[in-house]
UniProtKB/Swiss-Prot annotation:
The lineage of its organism: Eukaryota, Metazoa, Chordata, Craniata, Vertebrata. The gene is BANF2. The keyword Cytoplasm applies. Gene3D superfamilies: Barrier-to-autointegration factor, BAF. It comes from Bos taurus (Bovine). Belongs to the BAF family. Homodimer. Heterodimerizes with BANF1. Keywords: Cytoplasm, Nucleus. This is Barrier-to-autointegration factor-like protein.
Length: 90
């Protein structure tokens, strides 16, 4: 990846552990509230959804947009963050 935001770099620097979902790159405050309301309060829970979708970025992005109210930018950044985390830790 050519350019990593500081937030993405920080997220990729260590295992997910008990990080709140708001730590995931691309997750705005408003989107975090929507996700928590739907039961996705931790980054590992959101990662689980990504893995259930077999790491298919387009499918995951569509789900974030349609079901959670993400913008296209947020969905793209979030799926990229989780994909990069999987590359580093799985």
């Amino acid at each position: 990846m050519d350019h990593m935001s500081p937030r993405l770099r920080a997220f990729l620097s260590e295992p997910i552990g008990e990080k709140d979902v708001a730590w995931v790159d691309g997750i705005s405050h408003e989107l975090a509230i929507n996700l928590v309301t739907k039961g996705f309060n931790k980054a590992y829970v959101l990662l689980g959804q990504f893995l259930l979708m077999h790491k298919r970025e387009a499918e995951f992005q569509k789900w974030l947009i349609c079901c959670c109210g993400a913008t296209e930018f947020e969905a793209r950044e979030c799926s990229n963050c989780l994909k990069e985390w999987c590359s580093c830790f799985l």
